[in-house]
Curated annotation (Swiss-Prot):
It comes from Caenorhabditis elegans. Keywords: Metal-binding, Zinc, Zinc-finger. The keyword Zinc applies. This is Uncharacterized protein K02A2.6. Residues 223-235, 1257-1268 have a biased composition (Basic and acidic residues).
Length: 1268
């Protein structure tokens, strides 16, 4: 359980992140459920609660006070309770309402992926996909209640729907409508029966001031539609009222706004004081209409009253507790009400909130009052709220008035500085030079994405129109461009990548110092500040001619050279800073950092004077400023934080990363934190002074080892210390008296005397110090310090004892030394290995490949070797690889397992590829138990480690000076696997693994029996052979050496029959055929008889003159090795390497009987179907070996079966070459049918007559029927 606990990061509750617990639980749930499945329910609950940070655990413990033992709760119930306490409490209806309010403001405030993920998470969290039509109707119904008069009804109906959801009740739109009607009726009835309290009984908040108003009301005069103040906006834009959230008008013309709604009826009447601004707080009267706004704070919805004049945001204590009671900080400044009285607050806390769908972080102040005020500290963070506030602010502060006055004055007096367009510095030019040995580099243009092509074209045209760049046709230097999107505007900026082209490395540095933050802040002393921003600052400085030749960019439109200084040039910042420093030299209260210029003064008059002098310089140098980015006469400005009359303070946006930073856990994180903290400490007033008293001296404890070492170095033990402490030590002082007075008793009475009497002849007293021989007896109080001195340099026990026996002595000195060394951390951490324990070898498995040991060897010449050793047989598999990743390892093991099967257990070390999730998943899927050895202790996996050593030495011997390859590895493996192993009782690993001896080159030395044993066919082979022959109508075929044949020759995917000659035979079915000038090995099925040359012809096995010229069905005697005809039959083996040249005695007898059959016999063994011979046209005479025809004209039988079908050769029962008188003269022709009749009556009209054109199958069937 401790291992699981260490693998889980502790959860710390943060009110600003209500979804943090949900994400933490989802990330670690499998660890609790699957990895902790063997734990009991109580142990799992302990593990879960143990992973909570201390303050988070106490919060949970406080919420479960009614339960005596929180660990007795089940794991699932504990998860439910934790989710309820630390999870988001927003209801499903509220989540659905907020889901449709998500927006990406201005398209810039949120990353693309974050915005997409937020939409996906919101849709899943609100369960929109599971909503029925009734739920959608109710949802849209409630969403449409947005008018101010429907706020209470909407809140009531949402509570009604949520209560129904908890009860699992299915609501319809009609039910919500009925409940709405009930609420309206109750609301109207409550107005009728309610009694309006008197004016004096009304309670007024502290920050509200009641004013006297005229109670007499007049009927409002209908006003005409006034022209909106926003008519200058773009056409087509629909105005939105900030006050009532309706579209079609602005807040200044809103009828619901009491400041504007009854203007027609209040003309000429004096208005009471509606708001008073004191220290930034807006104080409103009781009768003023209030506008409320709901804001999501820390994942919970909070209703605020909008206060556009308040500089801070306030919440009540009850609301603060609802948010989870985030820790409060002390308020660093004074807060007062409108009447000047101070306002008491509990403190402030940093929270996260959402405005218009965008999340922000800012302080909120907690007070005892019930009203929550939404001030400008939050509103100004949202761009939409800032623009809306500009419409309803009805009072302008003094600073804003002065800022407007100064801006108008400067624009009137210096129109050239505020003029549109790009300025040009007339006093200075930028000069850049390269090193003398610099080699120009011309880089090609980078492709521009099609989506950005239009924007890049527009920017290049703008720069060309402004005179910044001009096209050229030739340049030695050229750099590609980089397109950057500007923050806030969405426009792009085209910059040159001079680093890529090598120009920055070749340019000489500009040695002008840049001002530090201390230099800038030292000049900013005052109460009034202005901030000036130059328009396209760098582009206002012109380059000289030599620099223009260097600043060249290569674009998709060609090459351009810069006429003005651009971003990306290495000396540009220093060069521009030099020009700006020269321009503002002599001006007090002006600080410049590149293009940011800050002016400070103690009064508005002095500030105005400095501004005039500065703008005179702008006019003289030709610089122009951007009026939109300038700020005049401000109380504070933002520059590396906030700068105001009180000094500088950090910006909360910039310090968010530091506030949310976790406690440092290593040196690098600590250095980063200290650097940031040191920078922020400079913004603290009097940070160099200590807040509390600091102790500079302490009294060290005698029991502290570290303190003793300090004392030891400062004050080593001396003779004086020994003498002084000996007098106070009871044992030493007693012995000193005995020695001085020589008062030893024959029979000691005390324990001290009994112990020291044995040393009385060796004891002596010198200058008040007791010695044993030449060793000083150290008192009890100094023994520990002396031990420290003896252990200086950290000697071992033996050396320390030898050293001590030369100087000191006391009772138990040896045991103290031993304990000192054993408890010294430095000595133990750097000690030798302890004595080994008895060997505990792995048990031998019962069968091979049950347990395997794996490891990696290498690298050897850039390659690694995966070693797999069987624990039973020592059989090894080695795979050569260049990668040792988990994926590669699994692939190699799967290849090995496909040969030997899956083992039961795998033993390996703790390599990352062997302890990865993928490897564990592979073992689990195959039912393999994976065990790992101890870390950095290879002996636990000794089988693999020993073989790795054998493998390395063996490969090194084989390869010599060469590199490792598969051929060398195979040589080693065949040698190792067939070498007797001592652990296998002299057997080889291969013999034990496979159960047989494998054949090697050494097997050639052993004599073998030359008698060839013909293996018999198995029953399965016989059945397969029988069905194959029956299905394909197999027939025996034989060819002789030097016989002319047709052989099938393949060319790619095509084949062709060509002339060939049999030159050699291999076994029973393979022949070597000469085709032209080359030899080809062919199967008997790829050869056909070639007729026309009768010197060598195909011989039917049943009519062969040699009874051994064919192979019988069941084998037989061995064929002679001469050039006799080689015949294959249905019974021939298909093994091409074993040429079957054997025939059976049965076939011999049958052949002899056929050849010796008497003429005219009609025995069933005779076959009267005779195959006609084919005589050559050059020999018209009748060949005795062929049947005699009636006509001497040579006739060829019509080939109806194709060239690939062999004509059946049959016998009439008489030997070939018989005369016509022996066969009979009754052969006549009748159309295409031939009828054979002989002189023997028994042969006339028999069933063996041949029918011309008859198919092979029909003829064979007819013959088979005759035989039956």
């Amino acid at each position: 359980m401790n291992d699981l606990k260490r693998s889980i990061q502790k959860f710390q509750f943060n009110v600003a992140e209500p979804e943090a617990f949900k994400r933490w639980l989802a990330r670690n749930k499998l660890t609790f459920v699957e990895d902790g499945k063997n734990l009991s329910e109580r142990e799992r609950t302990r593990l879960l609660l143990g992973c909570l940070e201390e303050s988070t655990f106490h919060r949970y413990e406080d919420s479960q006070r009614e339960i005596s033992d929180i660990y007795s709760i089940s794991f699932d119930d504990t998860v439910t309770a934790l989710t309820k306490i630390f999870g988001s409490t927003k209801s499903l209806m509220m989540r659905r309402q907020q889901c449709l309010q998500i927006c990406r403001a201005n398209g810039l405030s949120q990353d693309y992926l974050d915005y997409t993920n937020s939409i996906s998470d919101a849709v899943l969290d609100s369960k929109l996909s599971s909503m029925t039509s009734d739920e959608w109707s109710i949802f849209l119904f409630l969403r449409g209640l947005n008018s101010p008069g429907d706020e209470k009804a909407k809140l009531y109906l949402m509570q009604y729907v949520e209560a129904s959801e908890k009860k699992n009740e299915k609501l319809k739109l009609s039910d919500v409508h009925d409940e709405w009607m009930k609420f309206i009726q109750m609301h109207q009835q409550s107005k009728i029966v309610s009694v309006k309290p008197s004016k004096s009984s009304q309670q007024v908040d502290v920050n509200k001031v009641d004013t006297n108003r005229s109670k007499k009301k007049k009927k409002p005069i209908p006003r005409k539609p006034e022209k909106s103040s926003q008519d200058s906006k773009k056409k087509g834009e629909i105005p939105t009222c900030f006050y009532c959230n309706k579209k079609g008008h602005y807040a200044t013309n809103c009828r619901s706004n009491p400041k504007t709604g009854n203007q027609g009826g209040n003309k000429g009447k004096s208005k009471g004081c509606d708001s008073v601004h004191v220290d930034g707080l807006d104080v409103k009267t009781e009768h003023q209409a209030k506008h409320r706004m709901s804001v999501e704070v820390c994942g919970k919805d909070v209703a605020f009253q909008l206060d556009t004049g308040s500089m801070i945001t306030l919440i009540s204590v009850k609301c603060w507790e609802k948010l989870g009671s985030p820790p409060l900080e002390k308020v660093p400044h004074r807060i007062s009400c409108a009447n000047g009285t101070p306002m008491a607050v509990k403190g402030r806390c940093l929270v996260k909130f959402k405005l218009k769908g965008i999340e922000y972080t800012e302080y909120v102040y907690v007070r005892d009052r019930q009203t929550n005020l939404l001030g400008t500290s939050w509103l100004n963070l949202c761009p939409q709220m800032r623009s809306a506030l500009a419409q309803i602010v009805n009072q302008v502060s003094t600073s804003e008035t002065e800022a407007s006055r100064l801006e108008v004055m400067l624009k009137n007096d210096f129109p050239e500085v505020f003029k549109d367009g790009l300025g040009l510095c007339t006093k200075e030019k930028a000069e850049f030079r390269t090193e003398e040995n610099a080699v120009p580099v011309f880089k090609r243009a980078r492709p521009v994405p099609y989506g950005s092509l239009e924007a890049v074209e527009t920017e290049l045209n703008r720069l060309q129109e402004m005179g910044v760049i001009v096209p050229i046709t030739y340049a030695k230097w050229a750099a590609p461009i980089v397109v950057i999107k500007k923050k806030g505007t969405g426009k792009i900026r085209v910059c040159a990548d001079f680093k890529c082209s090598g120009l920055n490395a070749a340019l000489k540095d500009e040695f002008h110092p840049l001002p530090t933050s201390e230099d800038i802040f030292s000049r900013l002393k005052g109460t009034v500040y202005s901030q000036i921003d130059l328009k396209d600052a760098y582009l206002q400085v012109e380059l000289d001619e030599e620099a223009q030749k260097l600043a060249v960019i290569n674009t998709h439109r060609g090459i351009f050279k810069y006429l003005r200084m651009t971003f990306g040039l290495k000396p540009a910042p220093a060069s521009f800073q030099k020009i700006m420093d020269k321009m503002v030299s002599g001006l007090t209260g002006v600080a410049v950092y590149w293009d940011d210029i800050i002016i400070s003064a103690s009064s508005i008059e002095e500030h105005e004077k400095i501004l005039r002098e500065l703008f005179e310089r702008f006019k003289e140098y030709g610089f122009r400023v951007s009026a939109e980015k300038c700020a005049f006469a401000q109380k504070q400005v933002t520059f590396l934080g906030f700068v105001d009359e009180h000094g500088r303070r950090p910006d909360s946006k910039k310090t968010e990363a530091i506030r949310s930073m976790k406690a440092p856990t290593d040196q690098k994180q600590l250095a980063s934190f200290l650097g940031a903290a040191d920078w922020l400490s400079r913004m603290m007033q009097d940070h160099q002074q200590n807040a509390d008293d600091v102790v500079i001296a302490e009294i060290y404890d005698d029991d502290d080892d570290e303190d003793d070492s300090i004392i030891q170095k400062l004050n080593p033990v001396t003779e004086t210390d020994i003498r002084f402490e000996s007098q106070k030590d009871h044992e030493v002082s007693s012995v000193v008296k005995l020695v001085r007075n020589d008062s030893w008793k024959p029979k000691p009475s005390t324990e001290i005397e009994k112990h020291w009497i044995r040393y009385r002849d060796r004891l002596k007293l010198i200058h008040g110090c007791l010695l044993l021989d030449d060793r000083v007896i150290v008192p009890k109080s100094l023994q520990k310090i002396v031990l420290k001195q003896l252990h200086e340099g950290h000697p071992g026990i033996v050396q320390m004892k030898q050293k001590a026996r030369s100087f000191v002595f006391w009772r138990g000195l040896d045991s103290d030394i031993e304990n000192m060394v054993r408890h010294c951390n430095n000595c133990q951490e750097n000690s030798k290995m302890p004595r080994v324990v008895p060997l505990n070898p792995w048990p031998v498995p019962e069968a091979p490949w049950k347990r395997i040991h794996i490891d990696f060897a290498g690298p050897l010449n850039g390659c690694y070797l995966l070693v797999v050793v069987d624990a039973k047989t020592k059989y090894a598999e080695v795979k050569l690889t260049r990668s040792i990743s988990a994926v590669t390892t699994i692939d190699l093991l799967e290849e090995i397992f496909s040969i030997h099967g899956y083992p039961e257990t795998i033993i390996s070390d703790n390599g990352t590829q062997l302890t990865s999730h993928l490897f564990a998943q592979m073992c689990q899927s195959h039912g393999i138990e994976h065990k790992t050895s101890a870390v950095y202790y290879p002996r636990s996996n000794g089988a693999a480690e020993r073989f790795v050593d054998t493998l390395k030495r063996g490969i090194a011997k084989i390869k010599g000076e060469g590199s490792v390859n598969q051929q060398i590895l195979n040589k080693f493996l065949i040698s190792y696997r067939n070498t007797p192993h001592s652990a296998l009782n002299g057997s080889t690993p291969a013999e034990c693994h496979f159960g047989r001896k494998i054949r090697t080159t050494m097997s050639l030395l052993m004599p073998t029996d030359r008698v060839l044993k013909v293996p018999k066919l198995t029953q399965y082979q016989q059945n397969m052979k029988h069905h194959y022959e029956l299905r394909n109508g197999a027939r025996a075929k034989a060819f002789q050496v030097n016989q002319k044949v047709y052989v099938q020759v393949h060319h790619g995917n095509k084949s062709q029959w060509k002339h060939g000659v049999i030159r050699r035979k291999f076994g029973g079915v393979l022949y070597e055929v000469q085709v032209g000038d080359r030899m080809q090995k062919s199967h008997v099925n790829q050869i056909r008889t070639r007729y026309g040359d009768y010197s060598r012809s195909s011989v039917n096995p049943r009519l062969s003159s040699d009874p051994l010229g064919f192979v019988g069905e069941s084998g037989g005697d061995e064929m002679s090795r001469n050039d006799d005809p080689v015949v294959t039959s249905n019974g021939s083996s298909t093994d091409v390497n074993r040429g079957s040249r054997i025939t059976s005695e049965l076939k011999k007898k049958e052949s002899n009987a056929v050849r010796g059959q008497p003429c005219g016999s009609c025995s069933p063994t005779n076959n009267d179907v005779s195959a006609p011979g084919y005589a050559s046209r050059s020999h018209p005479t009748t060949d005795p070996s062929h049947s005699v025809r009636r006509s001497s004209r040579i006739r060829r039988v019509l080939d109806r079966y194709g060239s690939s079908v062999e004509h059946p050769s049959t016998s009439t029962g008489t030997p070939r070459g018989s005369t016509s008188t022996q066969l009979g003269q009754a052969s006549t022709r009748n159309g295409s049918r031939y009828t054979a009749s002989g002189r023997n009556p028994s042969c006339q009209g028999n069933r063996y007559s041949s029918i011309r054109g008859e198919g092979v199958t029909a003829r064979r069937e007819r013959v088979r029927t005759t035989w039956r």
